[in-house]
Amino acid sequence: MNPNQRIITIGSVSLTIAAMCFFMQIAILIITVTLHFKQYECNSPPKNNQVTLCEPTIIERNTTEIVYMTNTTIEKEVCPKLAEYRNWSKPQCKITGFAPFSKDNSIRLSAGGDIWVTREPYVSCDPNKCYQFALGQGTTLNNRHSNDTIHDRTPYRTLLMNELGVPFHLGTKQVCIAWSSSSCHDGKAWLHVCVTGHDENATASIIYDGRLVDSIGSWSKKILRTQESECVCINETCTVVMTDGSASGRADTKVLFIEEGKIVHISPLSGSAQHVEECSCYPRYPDVRCVCRDNWKGSNRPIVDINVKDYSIVSSYVCSGLVGDTPRKNDRSSSSNCLNPNNEEGGHGVKGWAFDDGNDVWIGRTISETLRSGYETFKVIEGWSKPNSKLQTNRQVIVDRGNRSGYSGIFSVEGKSCINRCFYVELIRGRKQETEVWWTSNSIVVFCGTSGTYGTGSWPDGADINLMPI
């Protein structure tokens, strides 16, 4: 082959390859544009209430050069899953005890940073993530406004919300105005019940998906208040326990049934419980169960069972003779008959929790019988079904006796096959006990149920009060 023929042959081959690449690029462009418009069809809302099925699509992007072509990227596009109401129909997880989960160290961090002054913390989760809540005092700790923040109810208190484990810094969202609150996620959006106003005529604002939807005023004109922990939603209906009236005598407790922020029914408390405040509630499909605080007659904790379908309420008391409130008698002397308050150190009290496990009961309480100091958990065999049962097992120390604790409450987390129970402990610091400073605030520690093994420890607040701003 002479030189001219070689040149012609090489040119022809190059021209053929270039033409092939050109047509392939046109084909790729057409496919890309087509898939782009299909993606928008997938993400757009269905018309005329029709259901649009979204399937994964594969997009191939090719990089072409004159001599060779390489495949570089394969991506999957999946349409977002439609949100559904939660029904909590899975069984409760079988556990052997509790394992450490989270600690925010808010007070220690306040020694050198701008952290909110808070109390009444709690934890609640949406289907994907857990959040911590607390009632802020309208000030950071290193601020003169923190003076005298021992008071529970002021117009400056707001409900704070952060991802669990993130202390309440200056960028924290203030969800609503509140000196008493409860929050829960129904699977589609957050519901917040926020109480504020005058003691004798407060208002509970019902906020759903970031909007004020409903409200209810004080019905007994004496400090309307709610759970200070998560509410519970079964399918579309969320239940919130609220009390108005005396903190040391007969009060008027009601259960609100709320759908997408609208109060659809109100049921009065019924059953044998004499005084109910600050309930810690959990889903027990198809119903809701709460363990509360009797601030009048009993150191045994009242139970409130809520039927979500027919709005009926039944109340009683935890059977365990190892009782959960503070103050209380020592374990040898304490008692409970499942039905009535035990009339043992009934005045005052502290928010706490317990939950049933078949006939048994898991309980969390302060270690001290008289003070909000230390914290322990344990299971009482037949403590849910047998009057005055006292066989204790699986005891764990969460905070040692020499360190302060406070309120505690329950929250539930749905796993792949079961619903786990978790709890938080409020670690109060400052006034009244610690008079070196003028403020009162808290941090939290969080544990969750485990079916595995676990060790021992103590997880107090840990701040040196002498290093803190006054």
Predicted regions and their residues:
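Short hydrophobic/aromatic patches on beta-strands that form ligand-binding or substrate-lining surfaces
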Residues: V117, Y131-F133, V193, E376-K386, ...
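Short beta-strand elements that form the blades of beta-propeller/WD-repeat-like
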Residues: R108, A189-H192, T239-V241, V288-R289, ...
